[in-house]
Swiss-Prot record:
Species of provenance: Prosthecochloris aestuarii (strain DSM 271 / SK 413)
Keywords in alphabetical order: Glycogen biosynthesis, Glycosyltransferase, Transferase
UniProt-listed InterPro entries: Glyco_trans_1, GS/SS, Starch_synth_cat_dom
Pathway where this protein functions: Glycan biosynthesis; glycogen biosynthesis
Protein's name according to its UniProt entry: Glycogen synthase
Family in the record: Belongs to the glycosyltransferase 1 family. Bacterial/plant glycogen synthase subfamily.
Top-level EC class as recorded in UniProt: transferase
Biological process terms in GO annotation: glycogen biosynthetic process
Length: 491
C-alpha cells in the first residue's frame, strides 16, 4: 500500500479545542495531523455537543449532509452534519448533530458514571449508526476507520452485520485505540434490544444483562492499540488497572499493540504560542518569569522571585489524582512553592479545593473549569507541573510541560514513564518521579525537586535540555502507518 493512498477516518467523543474532558482530546488534536504528515489522508467525525460554539470554531452546515436518515430497530431519526477544519490543519472535521441527542452539553456517559442511562444509550447507538450513514452520504470511502475508546465501539460490529451487504463498506478495516480501560460504556441489554436487530445483539459482549461497549469493541476491531507498551502490558497481564479487559484481549490472535503519544510542535511551541502572555525559547528563558508574573496576577497573587510556581491541570475523575492532590494540599502549602490548579469535573472536589485556596490566598489559586488559554498559560508559567494520575496509559501532559520548560512531577504510572527520564540524585533527566502512590512519597519528591531548583545552574540545564528534546509524533506515526498497512494486508 502506498502511503499517499491510505485514507483514514478518525472517530472520537472529544477533540481539543472543540471540547476537552481528558487526554484523549489532546491526542486527537494532534494525531490526525501527524498521520497526514506520514502520508495518510485524514478526516474526523465527532458528536456536535451543545457546548461546542459554532461561531467560535467556524462550524458551518453542509447542505448535502442534512436530513440523513438514521434507522434503528423501532424508529428513524434525522442527522445533520456541520463541518470545520481541525485548527492548524486542513483536516475536515464533521460534527454529527441531532437536537434530541446532542443539544445538551454533556459528553457520553454510562452506568459507571451514574448517567441518564436511557438517553445516553440512545445517543451512543445513534452516533455509531450516524458515522456509517454519514460516510455513505458523503461518498468518501476510507481504507481505515480508527476509533478512540468505547464511544464508537459498535462500528466494526455494525459493519459485520447490518451493513455487511453494503458494497460501499467492502474492504474497510477498523482500528481501536484504548486510552482509558476504566471507561467501558456499560448499558442495560434491554435498551439495545429496543434499538438494534438480533444479529447485532447476539455478537455483543453481555454480562449480567448489561452490554460492555469496550469489551464488544475489542472483540470486533481488526486491530487494537493503546498509547504505550507499559499500559499494553498492564491491560494484557490482568492487573487491577485492566478492569477485566485482559479477558477479551487474550482471545485476540493479534493481541494489543502499544504505541507512545507524541507532540505537535506547531501547536505546542512556546516560541510561537499565541495563547501565552510572552513567547519564549531557550535563548529567552527570562520571558518565562514574565508569564509566571502574569498568571499569578490573574489570580490575585504576587510573584515571589525565588519561589517556584507549581501548576496542575486535572480532571476530577477516578484515577486522575484529584483526591491525592486534595490530601496533599496542606503539606504542599508548608513548602516554599506557589500552586495554581486548573480543575474540571466533580463539583464537590472543586468546592473543597476552593476552600483550601481561601485558606492559603498567597500560595494557592484554583481555576474551576477547563480553558485552553489557561491550559497553555499554566504550561508557560510554571516551573514544575504536578501530574498526580494514579493510572495513565501515556498521557500528553508531561510532553506539554517538557516542551514549555516546566519540569513534570509524576507517579510511576504506566505509559507516562516511557516518555520521561527520571531526575534522581545527581543524575539529570526530564522529570521527578514518586514511586509510592501516597502523600508522603509525593511530598518527599517535591522536597527533592525544590533542592534541585535551588541549584540555579543545574535547574537551567534541566529546563533547556527538556526544551530541545524531540517529542514529536514522527516515530510513533510511522508505527501507526505500518500498523495500517498490516491491517490492510500490506497492499
Amino acid at each position: 500500500m502506498s502511503r499517499s493512498t491510505c485514507k483514514v477516518l478518525y472517530v472520537s467523543g472529544e477533540i481539543s479545542p472543540f471540547i476537552r474532558v481528558s487526554a484523549l482530546a489532546d491526542f486527537m488534536a494532534s494525531f490526525p495531523h501527524a498521520m497526514e504528515e506520514e502520508g495518510c489522508e485524514a478526516r474526523i467525525m465527532m458528536p456536535k455537543y451543545g457546548v461546542i460554539n459554532d461561531r467560535k470554531f467556524r462550524l458551518h452546515d453542509v447542505l448535502r449532509l442534512s436530513d440523513i436518515e438514521v434507522r434503528s430497530k423501532e424508529k428513524t431519526d434525522l442527522l445533520h452534519v456541520k463541518v470545520t477544519a481541525l485548527p492548524s490543519s486542513k483536516i475536515q472535521t464533521y460534527f454529527l448533530y441531532n437536537e434530541k441527542y446532542f443539544k445538551r452539553n454533556a459528553l457520553f456517559a454510562d452506568m459507571q458514571q451514574g448517567s441518564d442511562v436511557k438517553n445516553s444509550l440512545e445517543r451512543v447507538v445513534f452516533f455509531n449508526l450516524g458515522v456509517l450513514e454519514t460516510l455513505q452520504r458523503l461518498g468518501w470511502k476510507p481504507d481505515i476507520i480508527h476509533c478512540q475508546d468505547w464511544y464508537a465501539g459498535l462500528v466494526p460490529l455494525l459493519l459485520k452485520t447490518m451493513y455487511a451487504d453494503c458494497e460501499f463498506f467492502k474492504d474497510i478495516r477498523t482500528v481501536l485505540t484504548v486510552h482509558n480501560a476504566y471507561r467501558q460504556g456499560i448499558y442495560p441489554l434491554k435498551g439495545f434490544k429496543k434499538m438494534l436487530p438480533s444479529e447485532v445483539i447476539d455478537k455483543m459482549h453481555v454480562e449480567d444483562d448489561t452490554v460492555n461497549m469496550l469489551f464488544t469493541a475489542v472483540e470486533h476491531f481488526d486491530a487494537v492499540t493503546t498509547t504505550s507498551d507499559a499500559y499494553a502490558g498492564m491491560l494484557a497481564d490482568g492487573r487491577s488497572e485492566a478492569f477485566g479487559l485482559d479477558r477479551v484481549i487474550e482471545k485476540r490472535a493479534s493481541g494489543l499493540v502499544g504505541i507512545a503519544n507524541g507532540l505537535d510542535a506547531k501547536q505546542w511551541n512556546p516560541a510561537a504560542d499565541k495563547m501565552i502572555k510572552k513567547k519564549f525559547d531557550i535563548e529567552r528563558l527570562s520571558e518565562k518569569t514574565e508569564n509566571k508574573k502574569y498568571l499569578l496576577e490573574e489570580f490575585g497573587m504576587e510573584l515571589e522571585e525565588a519561589t517556584p510556581l507549581v501548576g496542575s491541570v486535572i480532571n476530577a475523575e477516578r484515577f486522575q489524582g484529584s483526591e491525592l492532590l486534595m490530601e496533599s494540599i496542606d503539606g504542599l502549602m508548608e513548602l516554599d512553592i506557589q500552586l495554581v490548579v486548573s480543575v474540571s469535573g466533580d463539583k464537590e472536589l472543586i468546592r473543597r479545593l476552593q476552600e483550601k485556596a481561601k485558606a492559603y490566598p498567597e500560595k494557592l489559586a484554583v481555576y474551576s473549569e477547563f480553558s485552553d488559554a489557561i491550559f497553555h498559560q499554566i504550561m508557560a508559567s510554571s516551573d514544575l507541573l504536578l501530574i498526580p494520575a494514579e493510572v495513565e496509559s501515556c498521557g500528553m501532559m508531561q510532553l506539554f510541560a517538557i516542551a514549555y520548560g516546566s519540569v513534570p512531577v509524576v507517579y510511576t504510572a504506566g505509559g507516562n514513564i516511557e516518555t520521561i527520564e527520571e531526575i534522581a540524585g545527581d543524575k539529570n533527566g526530564s522529570a521527578f518521579v514518586f514511586h509510592e502512590y501516597s502523600v508522603e512519597s509525593l511530598l518527599a519528591t517535591f522536597e527533592d525537586a525544590l533542592h534541585t531548583y535551588a541549584d540555579g545552574e543545574r535547574w537551567e540545564r534541566i529546563v533547556t535540555g527538556n526544551m530541545v528534546r524531540d517529542l514529536t509524533w514522527k516515530n510513533s506515526a510511522a508505527k501507526y502507518n505500518e500498523l495500517y498497512q498490516g491491517v490492510r494486508g500490506g497492499e
